Amino acid sequence: MENDIIYFSDFPNLQETGTRKDNGKFDLTLLPTQELKEEFRGYIMYRCKNGTFRALIQDRTAYNHIAKFLNSRINRRIKSLGDRNPEKWISLLKGWMLEQGITIVKEKKSVYGTVSYGEAVTILYFRNVLKFLGPEDLRDEIEKDVWELKNLDIKIRSNPIYNVKTLDFRKIYQPDIREECKKAVYMNLQYEAIGTVQGELTIMRIFSEYLQKEYSKIKSCSEIDREVLEEFLIHLSTKDTSHSANSSYVISLRRQLETIGKIYSYERLEHLFINTDIPPEVNAEFRVYSDDEMKRLNAEITQMDVQIARCLLIHQMLGTRISDTLTLRPDCLTRENGQDMIEIYQVKTKRYKKPISKELAKLLQSSIEYTQEKFGDTEYIFVNEKEPDRPMQYMAIKTKVMSMIQEKQLKDDHGELFGFGTHMFRHYYGVKLTEMHLDDWTIARLLEHKRLNNVQHYRKMSNQRMADETREVRQRMSDIIYMSLARWGEEYEQIRQDD
């Protein structure tokens, strides 16, 4: 039947030039019952209206596998997906896939090349179908184990370059601790940025897992005492994490437990920590790209997608934080007394202006025109192509740059593959400012540092500064060497003449 075929071409968002109509379709006649056809029709129509062409191609492969599964002997009496609970369906699907020689795990490669494993696409697709068809959860959002931030009745303080949509409490294994944590997170969301709250939730998951293994009788935060905390802090300090991560974890755990203590009147929690529990922060090594490294990176960056290449080059030329670059507005360019200026909205603080070169102004103007031609009027210059009302996402850029580095095997001066640290471009910019012999106040102003003492890091990394500061010592060492060579005979005289 014609209406049992759902064509991609019937949906404007799935139009793909050069694709034959018959190649882009879902065939509902593959399903054994009318009830199953209607159930899958609802989900497929939803996906076709909201998904991308590439995602739907992947969906179709998974759908075809599931259609074969539903026609197998084990399902011969099944009329509807509602005839079994979701976990039973998933268990049976996994068994069928193994029988058919279809892998039930998917290898996932991170942007850094590390490999992890998760459920195969077919299983994830079936989970989504079952969830879509399941009963609507009518509980208040804060009663659920996964919160949709858009459904909370508070304004979320977030950085628009990061796509945070949910908070997941499912891996806090003790039900009472999970509920206590929800109350604390809800309170902290009203005063803290979402990134800070995410850190608190992360350490609570780690703490919960530790309690489950080592103190399985503990069911509530009211039962946590100093001995339990000390044992956990020892466990945390012996894990393969950095000192700075441990320090942040302890601070986040303290904040979360003290909030729980205040809400539930668990007085013990408010006095559980002592100052020495927080490990001293180890200052991270201040690194900067060499000129050769910058040349190698930029040679490949300029071959990437034109708007991403512009974004990264503008980021380097401005010396801003990546969040400031990605949230630049189309009206950011101005001229004052013949000088091109740019207005920058800082996510963390305020907005400010700084002078820029004519070349940078032209590059910005090209970026603005590109976005206007492709997406019309937008709030940001660099936009998320799927959601143009939002800025380009940090992880999207990171993934594309790291993929390029892996593909090109692009290495630094030490023979190691480049990482992706947008702050390194900022360091390079700062070092170049010091080599122009600008004063600390001007450098701090151009980099929008609040304190002048931050400038010392850039000065220490400057090759010019190192050359100036070590010239006298190097000359003294040379004199000593020459004095020694002078005693060894005429054959070494040539060394001094060549110097």
Feature names for model-found ranges:
Residues 1-272, 300-303, 313-314:
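Charge-rich, intrinsically disordered N-terminal extensions
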Residues 146-169, 265-299, 343-350, 382-391:
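Flexible interdomain linker/hinge and immediately adjacent N-terminus
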Residues 196, 333, 388, 392-411, ...:
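Acidic, low-complexity interaction regions
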Residues 292-322, 426:
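Basic, Lys/Arg- and aromatic-enriched nucleic-acid-binding interface segment
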Residues 308, 318, 398-441:
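Short, basic (Lys/Arg/His-rich) helix/loop patches that form interaction surfaces
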Residues 318, 327-365, 453, 499:
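Conserved tyrosine-mediated DNA breakage-rejoining catalytic core shared by Y-recombinases
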Residues 324-326, 430, 437-449:
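Active-site-proximal segment of tyrosine recombinases
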Residues 358-416:
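Active-site/catalytic core of tyrosine-dependent DNA strand-transfer enzymes
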